[in-house]
Regions:
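Structural and coupling elements of P-loop NTPases
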Residues: 1-275
Length: 275
């Protein structure tokens, strides 16, 4: 998502991507946050497919928006390959994409065909020891801390010994891979083995964090990770002295607020909580 609230997630998820679709509104054009997400994708070495979307709008100006998009790529120092981006015109609401503004507008096949043609599969080695970069994390009442990432090399098997190392190569945690899940659409499906290239959810390490490398015990070199931009806003929470204090909401005590903030910081890498 382009919204700034999801900036931290966008940065992390890019490390799992082989390609990207840059969606631009055909009427509104390039938005401030478009520059942010595109700059991150370009730095990651991705070669985006530009999709001028919402051509069903009466005030669409697709050709002008395409020029604005090219200028944006140039301003972000895109290389020659990235500047030679393919373009499609689409309406997500109507369910079609075409190579031309006035194309037949039948279905999304042109987009799917272009993804297959333009996005090359990653060359990953399944014979090396297991290693993956922890990209996202969340707490589960049943599994405990769960880590999401793409397996960079090797295979992961349930119950195998694993460890977590930070960006400096220091061991953060060690344990057993208790559960592995793979995503099928939005559903998590338990599996026994995950292979290089799979995006998986693993459980078994309670101290591991985002940007740590989850790996076999013999692996000592961390996977490089892109540093997250630090939070740009600081909030101090104090006692509510308003005459209306205590009349709204159910969680009113400082302890309840603290517990909720701690929980959020465990799941959201864009938040830092101190007390």
């Amino acid at each position: 998502p382009g919204h700034r609230d999801f900036a931290a997630e966008v940065e992390r998820v890019l490390s799992m991507a082989d390609g990207a679709l840059l969606l631009i509104d055909s009427a509104e054009g390039v938005m401030p946050q478009t520059k942010f997400v595109l700059s991150k994708a370009l730095k990651q070495g991705l070669k985006p497919i530009v999709v001028i979307n919402k051509l069903d709008k009466a005030d669409q100006r697709a050709n002008e928006v395409l020029d604005e998009t090219f200028d944006l790529f140039v301003s972000l120092d895109a290389n020659e390959e990235q500047l030679d981006f393919p373009v499609l015109y689409a309406s997500g609401r109507s369910g079609w994409a075409d190579n031309e503004v006035d194309g037949p507008r039948k279905n999304l096949n042109p987009l799917l065909d272009l993804i297959v043609e333009h996005v090359k599969p990653a060359d990953l080695d399944k014979t090396k020891p297991f290693a993956m970069l922890s990209t996202l994390l969340y707490s589960d009442s049943f599994l405990g801390r769960s880590l999401v990432g793409r397996i960079a090399q090797g295979t992961a098997k349930a119950n195998q010994p694993i460890k977590a190392i930070n960006l400096n190569g220091e061991k953060v945690d060690e344990g057993k891979l208790t559960k592995i899940f793979r995503y099928e659409g939005t559903k998590k499906v338990p599996i026994d083995v995950g292979e290089a290239g799979d995006i998986v959810v693993v459980a078994g390490l309670e101290k591991a964090n985002v940007a740590d490398t989850i790996c076999n015990l013999e692996v000592n070199d961390p996977i490089p990770a892109t540093p997250i931009d630090p939070p740009t806003m600081s909030i101090t929470i104090t006692v509510n002295t308003s005459p209306l204090a205590g009349t709204e909401g159910k969680k009113l005590t400082s302890t309840q607020i603290r517990d909720r903030l701690v929980q959020e910081a465990q799941n959201n890498v864009g938040i830092t909580f101190t007390e």
